[in-house]
């Protein structure tokens, strides 16, 4: 088990700065959030960044939104490319979203403006069919874990809307591996611990953050009882990564001292509730990564 930090938590910072902050705070690894910045998909640059910071990339979050330049529009092709990138940087897990229920439209006005929005028009994407028919065999061939993420629901007045297909508990149970996102589960209006007990057999990856009507809050600050959740992971022998995934404002991005302090507090919270011997686990995890990374060069 590793406590990792999503680079998307400080997406307004450069990758090198994020990597060094995470390493200094005591995180064991990084989850790379692929976005519209070229640096998030350049394997050689990424290897140089993490080697300099002394922290591994343990997972890659596939590009989730169409319309980003230099990245495929097709959802299956985007996932394949994320797997290729994961192999290149030594990551063992790729996080992918389930299919969007509605069609996505991107509008560009060169050179800088890109607008993206979900339309009210339903779609039945080839990606959904691929997940049902080919995901398991593809994952086995690639020798990598592809963990489909539990996504949020959105409230419109009295209605709770799900913009994603295959995002019900009964659907997620069918995947060989999932990413359980705690703040997203909070938007469903269900009990987190009960949900985990139902899905535990397929939870291979965790996105950890709290909820206070805003998503992706600090684990130690919100309405979710994440201490008992971490203890439940430990009791069940969970061996995957626990990735802290936040919004920049939760860390008070822009204030270096506050960012460093909140990151350190978050690592301490996670270790206190999960790891009996935090120093040993962190050293063992990083040593294993350093050995694997040497084989990539």
What are these regions (language model features)?
Residues 29-30, 60, 124, 132-223:
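Acidic/histidine-rich catalytic cores of soluble enzymes
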Residues 16, 52, 69-177, 292, ...:
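Active-site acidic/histidine proton-transfer and metal-coordination neighborhood
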Residues 43-48, 72-80, 128-132, 161-166, ...:
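Charged helix-capping and loop-helix junction motifs
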Residues 8-15, 32-45, 65-75, 101-106, ...:
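Acidic-and-aromatic substrate-binding clefts and catalytic sites of carbohydrate-active enzymes
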Residues 1-92, 121-125, 173-177, 260, ...:
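N-terminal pre-domain/capping segments
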Residues 218-242:
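P-loop/Walker A phosphate-binding loop and immediately adjacent motor/lid segment at beta-alpha junctions
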Residues 27, 88-91, 143, 203, ...:
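A structural motif
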Residues 243-249:
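Short acidic/histidine-rich active-site segments
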